[in-house]
């Protein structure tokens, strides 16, 4: 079992039961899934640009990404409906906890001038979004083998009803808020 999941079961659940006065253990919020997305704008002109992003994302997440396509055509961007413009991965279960553990304890501390993640990035429904400017903060990525520095978005979807509950859950998991 993942280390973060063990911590969640042993320490976080009892602490949150006490703090938010839940009647039932099933009411305690948990992380449902983590979606990692890379948008590759240059894939419009150069479809080969997507291969590097797919490769990076599969190394970071440990599973094969799905290629995302444009929903509608936008003439200003020379974009047609159905063109491949990025890739994403949805992590659940053990892989999700492993990824979160690596993100919180290894990757985020490697960001330059890092002072913590923004506490305002909750969506009002208990989900947290985080943008990462470069994929090189992950230890799995070999700096010499990358073709280009890319950013990625990480969305942590929780079962929390409010932002306050989700913030408490992520903070007790070790997410470094400012």
Swiss-Prot record:
PROSITE patterns, alphabetized: RIBOSOMAL_L5
Read off the Gene3D superfamilies from this record: 3.30.1440.10
Q: Which residues cross the membrane?
A: none
Keyword presence, Signal: no
Output the superkingdom of the source species.
Bacteria
- List, alphabetically, the InterPro entries matched: Ribosomal_uL5, Ribosomal_uL5_bac-type, Ribosomal_uL5_C, Ribosomal_uL5_CS, Ribosomal_uL5_dom_sf, Ribosomal_uL5_N
Give the record's GO CC terms.
Answer: ribonucleoprotein complex; ribosome
- Is the keyword Cytoplasm in the record? no
Going by the UniProt record, its keywords in alphabetical order are:
Ribonucleoprotein, Ribosomal protein, RNA-binding, rRNA-binding, tRNA-binding
The protein's matches in Pfam families, at most eight in alphabetical order, are given as: Ribosomal_L5, Ribosomal_L5_C
Q: Name one GO molecular function term.
A: rRNA binding
Q: Which GO terms describe its biological process?
A: translation
Q: How does it assemble?
A: Part of the 50S ribosomal subunit; part of the 5S rRNA/L5/L18/L25 subcomplex. Contacts the 5S rRNA and the P site tRNA. Forms a bridge to the 30S subunit in the 70S ribosome.
Q: Which HAMAP family match?
A: Ribosomal_uL5_B
Protein's job: This is one of the proteins that bind and probably mediate the attachment of the 5S RNA into the large ribosomal subunit, where it forms part of the central protuberance. In the 70S ribosome it contacts protein S13 of the 30S subunit (bridge B1b), connecting the 2 subunits; this bridge is implicated in subunit movement. Contacts the P site tRNA; the 5S rRNA and some of its associated proteins might help stabilize positioning of ribosome-bound tRNAs.
Family label: Belongs to the universal ribosomal protein uL5 family.
Which PANTHER family does the UniProt record give? 60S RIBOSOMAL PROTEIN L11-RELATED
Query: What protein does this entry describe?
Result: Large ribosomal subunit protein uL5
Native organism = Syntrophomonas wolfei subsp. wolfei (strain DSM 2245B / Goettingen)
- Provide the taxonomic classification: Bacteria, Bacillati, Bacillota, Clostridia, Eubacteriales
The gene that this protein is the product of is rplE
């Amino acid at each position: 079992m993942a280390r973060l999941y063990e911590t969640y079961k042993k320490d976080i659940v009892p602490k949150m039961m006490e703090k938010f006065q839940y009647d039932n253990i099933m009411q305690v919020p948990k992380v449902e899934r983590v979606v990692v997305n890379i948008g590759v704008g240059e894939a419009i002109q150069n479809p080969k640009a997507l291969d590097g992003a797919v490769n990076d994302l599969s190394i970071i997440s440990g599973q094969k990404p799905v290629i995302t396509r444009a929903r509608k055509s936008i003439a200003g961007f020379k974009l047609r409906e159905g063109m491949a413009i990025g890739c994403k991965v949805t992590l659940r279960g053990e892989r999700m906890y492993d990824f979160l553990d690596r993100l919180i304890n290894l990757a985020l501390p490697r960001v330059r001038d890092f002072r913590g993640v923004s506490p305002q990035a909750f969506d009002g429904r208990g989900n947290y979004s985080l943008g990462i400017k470069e994929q090189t903060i992950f230890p799995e990525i070999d700096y010499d083998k990358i073709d280009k520095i890319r950013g990625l978005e990480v969305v942590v979807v929780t079962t929390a009803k409010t932002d306050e509950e989700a913030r408490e859950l992520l903070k007790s998991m070790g997410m470094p808020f400012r």
